[in-house]
């Protein structure tokens, strides 16, 4: 119900910023993006925040750029203090709002922020939050009483994901943070959906479901398919979570042991394309690794035999999209929209 009010307030503020000449380059610095990353971790944010913030930073300029490494560093030092689902187990965003909202959360975690960063209000972040109050410390926890001692997200790397992959450990069963299991591989979303509904599917809770061809180019558009459904056979046995790996995304309200954003994606020949059903995969979230348990020689042999899929588009917007879209680790933006792609674009001539 407050969205129209907030939209109107944003519109008024944008007009005021024009009159104040408070332009994006006066606000967006790397420190702002690092503040945003730390706040996202404390919030128990969506995995999509990684893609958005990386893309925004790369548009803001080379001096502002953040990477998966910045998220990994933040995830090791900033605890989750917003006790809301899916990281929390009881409260919703409405409860968060009435507990003090974002200003209160930022005040609670101010030790992890640079207070001198300029904001769209024309004031620093420190000035913005100085009078904020927490009205319910079970919803917005003190740092000493965090619901999860490390950040909401973890960045994994290994021979399956040399460019990185992402998991939300605060929203998955603890037993899957260190796990080795056999892969069950699907090359398309329809194939996966059909298989998981088969009550005779050869699958156990220890299996790792793998969905590929769901990345930026393979999807196309990196759809939110990453929260793969638990096979019906296992659901009837009471299983509610299992490891799942894909080059897709998932919604911020989704949960489970889902490893997402595998980069480079399988559609362009990333190592995820080389995984076979039955291969053992080891995931070690505390040590930030994800590994296909085969030799480098075997991996090279599979790569040599890999055949690229036929192009999805040969003309039009789909062709342009496939040609210019970046991988997840680089923000899934068009390469030509980054500031380092070419010279600045001048204002158009008006005749």
Mark where each language-model region is.
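Catalytic or ion-coupling anion/metal-binding cores of large enzyme and transporter domains
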Residues: 1-266, 270-351
């Amino acid at each position: 119900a407050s969205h129209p009010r907030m939209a109107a307030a944003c519109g008024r503020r944008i007009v005021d910023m024009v009159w104040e000449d408070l332009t994006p380059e006066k606000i967006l610095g790397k420190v702002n993006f690092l503040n945003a990353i730390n706040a996202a971790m404390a919030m128990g944010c969506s995995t999509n925040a990684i893609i958005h913030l990386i893309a925004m930073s790369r548009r803001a300029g080379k001096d502002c750029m953040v990477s998966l490494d910045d998220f990994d560093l933040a995830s090791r030092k900033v605890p989750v203090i917003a006790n809301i689902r899916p990281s929390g187990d009881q409260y919703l965003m409405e409860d968060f709002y009435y507990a003090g909202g974002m200003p209160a959360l930022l005040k609670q975690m101010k030790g992890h922020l640079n207070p001198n960063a300029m904001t769209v209000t024309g004031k620093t972040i420190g000035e913005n939050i100085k009078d904020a109050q927490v009205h319910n410390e079970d919803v917005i926890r003190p740092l000493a009483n965090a619901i999860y001692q490390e950040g909401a997200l973890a960045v994994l790397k290994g021979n399956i994901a040399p460019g990185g992959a992402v998991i939300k450990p605060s929203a998955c069963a603890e037993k899957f943070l260190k796990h080795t299991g056999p892969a069950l591989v699907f090359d398309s979303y329809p194939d996966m959906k059909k298989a998981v509904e088969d009550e005779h599917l050869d699958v156990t809770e220890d299996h790792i479901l793998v969905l590929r061809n769901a990345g930026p180019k393979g999807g196309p558009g990196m759809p939110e398919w990453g929260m793969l459904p638990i096979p019906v056979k296992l659901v009837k046995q009471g299983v509610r979570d299992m490891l799942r790996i894909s080059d897709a995304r998932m919604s911020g309200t989704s949960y489970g042991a889902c490893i997402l954003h595998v980069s480079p994606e399988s559609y362009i020949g990333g190592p995820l394309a080389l995984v076979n059903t039955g291969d053992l995969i080891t995931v070690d979230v505390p040590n930030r690794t994800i590994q296909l348990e085969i030799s480098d020689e075997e991996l090279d042999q599979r790569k040599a035999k890999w055949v690229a899929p036929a192009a999805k588009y040969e003309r039009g917007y789909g062709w342009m999209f496939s040609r210019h879209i970046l991988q997840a680790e680089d923000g899934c933006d068009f390469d030509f929209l980054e500031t380092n792609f070419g010279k600045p674009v001048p204002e158009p001539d008006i005749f």
